[in-house]
């Protein structure tokens, strides 16, 4: 998992509340358990004018010109600005996978569904919670100023606007540690690899019949 320390990125505003995981990555694309290949189908039903199917050449599909991510001014965005209850609906790690592969490292919203919120941290995506009034103001500024960027400092737990105003956010210390050091569940386990091998060696000697 890529470490997350500091980043400055273009902001794309998704002005919709209660965006669910099936809207983030539709169910027909969930057959793969690999973490790659989902970016082209992020927000598929909004992003394209046709019905998406696995294995399609997305470069030949008709784009919806009204969808925010298809607008030239938001190309290359790495910060997604969203509304309340982002990531609701069914549990699927494919949702943060798709956001990450598209290029988003950060989501900013007033609130999230719990499962999506937890899955995001486990997959290198930082979901920041800001007060609704702060999010409202960000939407106004992003839409009024082309090329609007935010600077996020995870260690300091700050979001800095182009005008210099700093917004603080809370994050669980353990999740913060994992993101700063690029540690997913496998990475955390491998930190104790020597202790695990030592236990297995001792257990094999104590209970040899279990390994025959």
Swiss-Prot record:
Annotated EC: 4.2.1.33
Catalytic activity: (2R,3S)-3-isopropylmalate = (2S)-2-isopropylmalate
Keyword Lyase recorded: yes
InterPro entries: 3-IsopropMal_deHydase_ssu (IPR004431), Aconitase/3IPM_dehydase_swvl (IPR015928), AconitaseA/IPMdHydase_ssu_swvl (IPR000573), IPMI_Swivel (IPR033940), LeuD (IPR050075)
Protein's pathway: Amino-acid biosynthesis; L-leucine biosynthesis; L-leucine from 3-methyl-2-oxobutanoate: step 2/4
Matches recorded under Pfam families: Aconitase_C
Keywords: Amino-acid biosynthesis, Branched-chain amino acid biosynthesis, Leucine biosynthesis, Lyase
GO molecular function: 3-isopropylmalate dehydratase activity
GO terms under cellular component: 3-isopropylmalate dehydratase complex
Gene Ontology terms: biological process: L-leucine biosynthetic process
Family, per entry: Belongs to the LeuD family. LeuD type 1 subfamily.
Assembly: Heterodimer of LeuC and LeuD.
Function: Catalyzes the isomerization between 2-isopropylmalate and 3-isopropylmalate, via the formation of 2-isopropylmaleate.
Protein name (record): 3-isopropylmalate dehydratase small subunit
Name of the coding gene: leuD
């Amino acid at each position: 998992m890529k470490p997350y320390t500091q980043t400055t990125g273009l902001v794309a505003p998704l002005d919709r509340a209660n965006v669910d995981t099936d809207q983030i990555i539709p169910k027909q694309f969930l057959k793969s358990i690999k973490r790659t290949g989902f970016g082209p189908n992020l927000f598929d039903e909004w992003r394209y004018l046709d019905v998406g199917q696995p294995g399609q050449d997305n470069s030949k599909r008709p784009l919806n010109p009204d969808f925010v991510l298809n607008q030239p001014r938001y190309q290359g965005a790495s910060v997604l600005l969203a509304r309340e209850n982002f990531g609701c609906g069914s549990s699927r790690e494919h949702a943060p996978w798709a956001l990450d592969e598209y290029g988003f490292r950060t989501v900013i919203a007033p609130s999230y569904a719990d499962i999506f919120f937890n899955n995001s941290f486990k997959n290198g995506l930082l979901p920041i919670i800001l007060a609704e009034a702060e999010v409202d103001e960000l939407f106004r500024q992003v839409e009024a100023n082309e090329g609007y960027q935010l600077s996020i400092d995870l260690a300091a737990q700050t979001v800095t606007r182009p005008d210099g105003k700093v917004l603080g956010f809370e994050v669980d210390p353990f999740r913060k540690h994992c993101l700063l050091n690029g540690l997913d569940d496998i990475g955390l386990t491998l930190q104790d690899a020597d202790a695990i091998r030592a236990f297995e060696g001792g257990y094999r000697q104590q209970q040899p019949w279990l390994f025959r």
